[in-house]
UniProtKB/Swiss-Prot annotation:
Function: Large subunit of the glutamine-dependent carbamoyl phosphate synthetase (CPSase). CPSase catalyzes the formation of carbamoyl phosphate from the ammonia moiety of glutamine, carbonate, and phosphate donated by ATP, constituting the first step of 2 biosynthetic pathways, one leading to arginine and/or urea and the other to pyrimidine nucleotides.
Domain notes: The large subunit is composed of 2 ATP-grasp domains that are involved in binding the 2 ATP molecules needed for carbamoyl phosphate synthesis. The N-terminal ATP-grasp domain (referred to as the carboxyphosphate synthetic component) catalyzes the ATP-dependent phosphorylation of hydrogencarbonate to carboxyphosphate and the subsequent nucleophilic attack by ammonia to form a carbamate intermediate.
Domain ATP-grasp span(s) in chain numbering: 133-328, 677-868
Signal peptide from the UniProt entry: none
Top-level taxon of the source organism: Bacteria
Binding site for Mg(2+) 4: E839, N841
Species name: Arthrobacter sp. (strain FB24)
Protein's recorded name: Carbamoyl phosphate synthase large chain
SMART domains: CPSase_L_D3, MGS
Annotated family: Belongs to the CarB family.
Positions with a binding annotation for Mn(2+) 1: Q285, E299
Classification via NCBIfam families: CPSaseII_lrg (TIGR01369), PRK05294.1 (NF003671), PRK12815.1 (NF009455)
Length: 1099
C-alpha cells in the first residue's frame, strides 16, 4: 500500500530538555523522522524547547518552534500553522502526554488535526496501568498481581492484600519517575505520595514483588496490514528491581532458551495487536521467574523509547525512520533496509555479535544522594560496545565509560574481604558488577553470588572466565602471541595487560603490534553477513577478516564525546555532527568515532564511516591505523567533543597523528596557569588574583594573600567537577583533605572569588588573522554559580557598548595569544567596572548550539572548515556561512532576545532517608540539559524559558520569601511589585519584619526549626507540601537557617513548584511574571526570527 496522499503538513512534538530518563535518544529519533517527512514532500513543523538538538536546526523543518512544550503553547502553534496531523511518538513521554492533553482539551477536534503513529486509544491502553492489565489478560498472558489506586487510603488497603515488599509504579511518567520499592508502610506512604503527585492522572499501580526475576525487553514494529517484526531482544544483566535504564543490558538476549524466547515473542505479538499499535514501534518488558519459568508482562511503551535507540544502534535497523514511514501509511514490506539496500524492513534483523550497554552515573555530583539503584532511573548517560562475545563487549563498554575504576580490577583479593563483598553485592549499586567480579576472584562460588544477587549464573560464569584469563596473564613469563591473542579476544585493554604483567601500556602495545596482533573491523549489517552492507558502520574485534573498504581520498576523523554526563552532554555531540555535515558538503570523507548509542553522531548516515569504539588512546590509535591502511588520514579533530577527545590531543600528536584546528600546544597553554597568565599580561588583561597549591600549607598561604572567599578547584576538569567556594580556613583545610589527587602534576587552583560580579560568556571563531565573535552572553545569576547551571541571555541586556567593545578586544587578544584555529570560549567577570578573565577554553563549548540558534549562524560548521584551512573571509564571501559584515557582538538593538535556562535533576536524587537532595546552585555543575526561550523582549523570553524547564512561574497565589541578611535590601522592590500585582507574600521572622517596615503586607509563618505550634499551626515546609505555596524564594545563609533553607527547598523540589535561590534570578522572575500578566504570548519560528534579524541587520 503506498503512502497516504491526504496529508500535506505534519507537526512533530519533540521531547524538550535532556532529563534523566529522556535524553539524547529522542534527538536521534526525531532527526530521522524529520528527514523522512521532508523526503516525502510534506511541510514539516517542529516544536522542541531544546536548542542543543540537531532536530531544531532550521534546515530540518519548514517551521521550527523553540517554544515550551505545553498544551497551551502547542495549541497556539496548531492555530497558526494548521497542520493536518501530529506525530507524537518520537518525543518521549513529554510528547505523548502533550498529545493526550490536546485531545482531552478538544484542541485536535477544534482544528481537525489527527494523530499519526499512534492513536489515543492505543496510547491509553499502553500507558494506563489498569487498562494495560486488561490487555495482558485478554492475550492469555499474566501480569503481576496488582491494585490500581488513586489515594493513600486505597494504597494502605491494597497493601493488606499484596503484602510487603511491593513495587509502586505511577501511570504516564517516564524513567520510572515517582516509582520505588516499598518494604514498609513508611516507604509506601512516601513513595505513593510522590507517585500520586508525579502521575498526571494521579494514578498509581501497586504490584506484588517480582524482585530477583530475570528482566527482558522486546523491541517490536507493526504496520497497518498486521505485519509484525521483532527488531531486537534485550536482556538486563541485573534482575528485576533495577530500572532498565540503570542496568547493564545485553542484546540479543543470551540466557533464554528457544522455547522461552518463542513464548515472549508470541505474547508480544498478541499484545501489540490488542493495544492497536498499527503504524509504528513499541517495546514490551517481561519478567521471567528463574526457577519455574513463569512469565509476567511488566509494561509497554507505545512509542519510540530509550530502548529503541539502543536497538537501532545495536542492529542497524533504523526504528525511528521506519516508524515514521509506517505512520504515513507505508507497510514494512515496502520500506527498503538502508544498510543492505536489498532486503525490506519486514526482514527481522539477525546479530552475529553481542552488544552491551552500560549506564554512566553522576552520584559524585550529589554526595547526599542514596546510591542504591531502584525502579527510579538515576543514570545520566550510557556507553555501548560490540564484540564477538559477551566478555569482549562488556570490557569494551566498561572502558568506554571513562570513569576512574570503571574497568574491571584483577588485583589480589584477600580472603577476609570476600564475605564483605558478597554482603555488599546484595544491594544493587553502581559498584555491584565490580563487587561480584572481585568476590569471584577472591574464591566465592557462582552459587553464593547467584543467591546474593540473583544475577543469572551464565553471566557469573563469564565473569569467572575473565578472572581465569587474568590469572593466565599474570602467570605468563613473557608477552607471548598466544596469551595476547586470548586476552584481546576477551576484551582486555593494553593498560589492563600491562598492570597484570608489570609493564607500561606503551610497552604492551609495542610488543602486540610487532607481533601483528591488531583488531579487525567488522560491519553491522542487520543480517549476519547474509547480504552485502552498503553503510560502513564498524566495530573492532580480534578476529580474522577485516571489513573496512578501501577509500579513494584521505579521511578526516572526528572524535566524539562519549557517554553523556553532567558537564559534557548533547551540546558537544551537536558540534561533532555539524562538523561532519560541513566537511562532507565540502567534499571530505568523514569518520566518526564514538560509543554513545543515544546520539545523532552515531547514526550510520551522519558520517562517511562510523566506528562504534571506546574513546581511549588504544582504541583511537587502532581506528586511525585502520584508516591509514585503507586510504590515509588527513587529520583528526579533537576540539569538538569536549574534554574526552581533548585529553587525547597531546598523546595523539606524540604518536605522529596530525591534529586539525587548534594545536595540542595551544590547548595546553590555555589550561596551564603560568603560560596563560603570560598571554594575559602581554595583552594587558587581568584575571582574579590566583595561585596553584600542591599542599594545604601552600593553599593557606595563597588564600591569606588574596583574601577570602576563594574559589578552589582541581586543574583539567569540565563541568566544575570538585569546584567549591571556600569562605574560611577550616573549610579550606576540609577541601584539601578531601581532594582525591593533589600532586605537582595535578595541583589545586585557587582564585579570588569575585562577589557581586556579572559573568559574561563568549563564543568566537579565529583563523589566525581574523576573528568572528559569535555571541556575548550575559549570565543572569551572579558569578559563583557554574556557567552550565546559570541562565544567560543573548544579546546582553545590561552591558553597555563600552563593555562589549572591551570584551571584543580581550577575546581577540586571547585567541591570538593562545594560537586558536577554530572555536574558543572565554568567560569574563565584570566587577566594579573592571573586566576580569576567568578562563579560556580553546574548543567547542556547551553554549555553541545556543549561540547558533539565537543568532542564526552555525558556528561548529564554520570551525570545522577553519580547521581545514578555510579563512573567515572565505566563510563570509564564498561559503556564505557567516554574515558578510559584522558579527554576534553587533546585533541590532531590537534583535530577538534569547534566554538559555538549565534543567536540573534534583527530584531524581534522594537521601537514604527519602528526602530530595538540596537544589542550591554553586560552582559545581549539576544540570543535565537546557532549554531556550526566545521573544522580542527579555521578560517574555525569560518566562518562556522557565515554562520550558518545567518551572513555570505563577501568575497569582502565594509566594514565600526568606532571604539571608546580605540580600534583604536587594529584594524589597521586587517583593513590593509582586504584592502590588496581588500576590500574597508569606515570610518568616526577620524577612517578614523588613518587608513590613517597607510597607509590604507579609503573613508570618513558622520556620522549620520551630516545628508546629501547640494549636497545630504548621511550618513553612508543611504549607509547601500541602500545595498552599506557588513559588519559593530563598537565598542561603549559615547556621540553623541553612538547615531551614534546605528543608523548604527540598519540599519545593519534591512537589515541583519554582524555587529561586539567587536575587538576580528573582528580579528576572518578577519581570517575567509581570509580562505574563500583561501580554499574550506569541509563537515565532526560528526561520521567522532569522528573517527578521536579517532585515534588521540590512535595514
Amino acid at each position: 500500500m503506498p503512502k497516504r496522499t491526504d496529508l500535506k503538513s505534519v507537526l512533530v512534538i519533540g521531547s524538550g530538555p535532556i532529563v534523566i530518563g529522556q535524553a539524547a535518544e529522542f534527538d536521534y529519533s526525531g532527526t530521522q523522522a524529520l528527514r523522512v517527512l521532508k523526503e516525502e514532500g510534506l511541510r514539516v513543523i517542529l516544536v522542541n524547547s531544546n536548542p542543543a538538538t540537531i532536530m531544531t536546526d532550521p534546515e530540518f523543518a519548514d517551521a521550527t518552534y523553540v517554544e515550551p512544550i505545553t498544551p497551551e503553547v502547542v495549541e497556539k502553534i496548531i492555530a497558526k500553522e494548521r497542520p493536518d496531523a501530529i506525530l507524537p511518538t518520537l518525543g518521549g513521554q513529554t510528547a505523548l502526554n502533550t498529545a493526550i492533553a490536546l485531545d482531552k482539551n478538544g484542541v485536535l477536534e477544534k482544528y481537525n488535526v489527527e494523530l499519526i503513529g499512534a492513536n489515543i486509544a492505543a496510547i491509553e491502553l499502553g500507558e494506563d496501568r489498569e487498562k494495560f492489565k486488561g490487555v495482558v489478560e485478554r492475550c492469555g498472558a499474566e501480569s503481576a498481581r496488582s491494585h490500581i489506586i488513586h489515594s493513600m487510603d486505597e494504597a494502605l488497603k491494597a497493601a493488606e492484600d499484596l503484602g510487603y515488599p511491593m513495587v509502586v509504579r505511577p501511570s504516564f511518567t517516564m524513567g520510572g519517575l515517582g516509582s520505588g520499592l516499598a518494604y514498609t508502610e513508611d516507604d509506601l506512604r512516601r513513595i505513593v505520595g510522590q507517585g500520586l503527585q508525579y502521575s498526571p492522572t494521579s494514578e498509581v499501580l501497586l504490584e506484588e514483588s517480582i524482585l530477583g526475576w530475570k528482566e527482558y525487553e522486546l523491541e517490536m514494529m507493526r504496520d497497518k496490514n498486521d505485519n509484525v517484526v521483532v527488531v531486537c531482544s534485550i536482556e538486563n544483566f541485573d534482575p528485576v528491581g533495577v530500572h532498565t535504564g540503570d542496568s547493564i543490558t545485553v542484546a540479543p538476549a543470551l540466557t533464554l532458551t528457544d522455547r522461552e524466547y518463542q513464548r515472549l515473542r508470541d505474547i508480544s505479538i498478541a499484545v501489540i495487536r490488542e493495544v492497536g499499535v498499527d503504524t509504528g514501534g513499541c517495546n514490551i518488558q517481561f519478567a521471567v521467574e528463574p526457577d519455574t519459568g513463569r512469565v509476567v508482562v511488566i509494561e509497554m511503551n507505545p512509542r519510540v523509547s530509550r530502548s529503541s535507540a539502543l536497538a537501532s544502534k545495536a542492529t542497524g535497523f533504523a526504528i525511528a525512520k521506519i516508524a515514521t514511514k509506517l505512520s504515513l501509511g507505508y507497510t514494512l514490506d515496502e520500506i527498503p533496509n538502508d544498510i543492505t539496500q536489498k532486503t525490506p524492513a519486514s526482514f527481522e534483523p539477525t546479530l552475529d555479535y553481542v552488544v552491551v550497554k552500560v549506564p554512566r552515573f553522576a552520584f559524585e555530583k550529589f554526595p547526599a544522594a542514596d546510591p542504591t539503584l531502584t525502579t527510579t532511573m538515576k543514570s545520566v548517560g550510557e556507553a555501548m560496545a560490540m564484540g564477538r562475545n559477551f566478555t569482549e563487549a562488556l570490557q569494551k563498554a566498561l572502558r568506554s565509560l571513562e570513569q576512574k575504576g570503571s574497568q574491571l580490577d584483577f588485583s589480589h583479593v584477600p580472603e577476609w574481604e570476600v564475605p564483605e563483598l558478597i554482603e555488599k553485592a546484595k544491594r544493587p549499586t553502581t559498584e555491584r558488577l565490580h563487587q561480584v567480579q572481585r568476590a569471584l576472584l577472591g574464591g566465592a562460588t557462582v552459587e553464593q553470588l547467584f543467591e546474593a544477587t540473583k544475577i543469572d549464573p551464565w553471566y557469573l560464569d563469564q565473569l569467572q572466565l575473565l578472572n581465569e584469563i587474568s590469572h593466565e596473564i599474570r602467570k605468563s613469563t613473557a608477552l607471548t602471541p598466544e596469551m595476547l591473542q586470548r586476552a584481546k579476544r576477551h576484551g582486555f585493554s593494553d593498560e589492563q595487560i600491562g598492570a597484570l604483567t608489570n609493564n607500561q601500556e606503551a610497552v604492551v602495545r609495542g610488543v602486540r603490534q610487532a607481533l601483528g596482533i591488531r583488531p579487525v573491523y567488522k560491519t553491522v549489517d542487520t543480517c549476519a553477513a547474509e547480504f552485502a552492507a552498503y553503510t560502513p558502520y564498524h566495530y573492532s574485534s580480534y578476529d580474522e577478516e577485516d571489513e573496512v573498504a578501501l577509500h579513494s581520498k584521505p579521511s578526516i576523523i572526528i572524535l566524539g564525546s562519549g557517554p553523556n554526563r553532567i558537564g559534557q552532554g548533547i551540546e558537544f555531540d551537536y558540534s561533532c555532527v555539524h562538523a561532519s555535515m560541513a566537511l562532507r558538503k565540502a567534499g571530505y570523507e568523514t569518520v566518526m568515532v564514538n560509543c554513545n548509542p543515544e546520539t545523532v553522531s552515531t547514526d550510520y548516515d551522519v558520517s562517511t564511516r562510523l566506528y562504534f569504539e571506546p574513546l581511549t588512546l588504544e582504541d583511537v590509535l587502532e581506528v586511525i591505523a585502520a584508516e591509514e591502511r585503507t586510504g590515509g588520514v588527513m587529520g583528526v579533530f579533537v576540539q569538538l567533543g569536549g574534554q574526552t577527545p581533548l585529553k587525547l590531543a597531546q598523546q595523539l600528536a606524540d604518536a605522529g597523528v596530525p591534529i586539525l584546528g587548534t594545536s595540542p600546544e595551544a590547548i595546553d597553554l590555555a589550561e596551564h596557569r603560568g603560560a596563560f597568565s603570560r598571554v594575559l599580561d602581554e595583552a594587558g588583561l587581568i584575571s582574579p588574583k590566583n595561585g596553584t597549591a600542591v599542599s594545604f600549607e601552600d593553599a593557606k598561604k595563597i588564600a591569606d594573600e588574596i583574601g577570602y572567599p576563594v574559589l578552589v578547584r582541581p586543574s583539567y576538569v569540565l563541568g566544575g567537577r570538585g569546584m567549591e567556594i571556600v569562605y574560611d580556613e577550616p573549610n579550606l583545610s576540609r577541601y584539601i583533605a578531601n581532594a582525591t589527587e593533589i600532586t605537582t602534576e595535578h595541583p589545586v587552583l585557587i582564585d579570588r572569588f569575585l562577589e557581586d560580579a556579572v559573568e559574561i560568556d563568549v563564543d568566537a571563531l579565529y583563523d589566525g588573522t581574523e576573528m568572528y565573535l559569535g555571541g556575548i552572553m550575559e549570565h543572569i545569576e551572579e558569578a559563583g554559580i557554574h556557567s552550565g547551571d546559570s541562565a544567560c541571555v543573548l544579546p546582553p541586556i545590561t552591558l553597555g557598548n563600552n563593555v562589549i567593545e572591551r570584551v571584543r578586544t580581550a577575546t581577540l587578544a586571547i585567541a591570538e595569544g593562545v594560537g586558536v584555529r577554530g572555536l574558543i570560549n572565554i568567560q569574563f567577570a565584570l566587577a566594579s567596572d573592571v573586566l576580569y578573565v576567568l578562563e579560556a577554553n580553546p574548543r567547542a563549548s556547551r553554549t555553541v548550539p545556543f549561540v547558533s540558534k539565537a543568532t542564526g549562524v552555525q558556528m561548529a560548521k564554520a570551525a570545522a572548515l577553519i580547521g581545514t584551512g578555510v579563512t573567515i573571509n572565505q566563510l563570509r564571501s564564498a561559503y556564505k556561512m557567516l554574515p558578510e559584515t559584522g558579527d554576534g557582538s553587533t546585533l541590532p538593538f531590537d534583535a530577538p532576545v534569547s534566554v538559555k535556562e538549565a534543567v536540573l535533576p534534583f527530584s531524581r536524587f534522594r537521601t537514604p532517608e527519602g528526602k530530595v537532595v538540596d537544589s542550591l546552585l554553586g560552582p559545581e555543575m549539576r544540570s543535565t540539559g537546557e532549554v531556550m526561550g526566545i521573544d522580542k523582549h527579555f521578560d517574555t523570553a525569560f518566562a518562556k524559558s522557565q515554562a520550558a524547564a518545567n518551572n513555570a512561574l505563577p501568575t497569582e497565589g502565594k509566594i514565600f520569601v526568606s532571604v539571608a541578611n546580605r540580600d534583604k535590601r536587594s529584594v524589597i522592590m521586587g517583593v513590593k511589585r509582586l504584592s502590588d500585582l496581588g500576590f500574597e507574600i508569606v515570610s518568616t521572622g526577620g524577612t517578614a519584619d523588613v518587608l513590613r517596615r517597607n510597607g509590604i503586607q507579609a503573613t508570618p509563618v513558622r520556620k522549620v526549626a520551630e516545628g508546629s505550634s501547640a494549636e497545630g499551626e504548621g511550618t513553612i515546609a508543611d504549607l509547601i507540601v500541602a500545595g498552599e505555596i506557588d513559588m519559593v524564594f530563598n537565598t542561603p545563609s549559615g547556621g540553623e537557617a541553612r538547615i531551614d533553607g534546605y528543608e523548604l527547598r527540598a519540599a519545593a523540589t519534591s512537589i515541583g513548584i519554582p524555587c529561586i535561590t539567587t536575587v538576580a534570578e528573582f528580579n528576572a522572575a518578577v519581570q517575567a511574571i509581570e509580562a505574563q500578566r500583561t501580554y499574550e504570548w506569541s509563537v515565532t519560528s526560528l526561520q521567522e526570527h532569522a528573517e527578521n534579524l536579517k532585515a534588521l541587520q540590512n535595514g
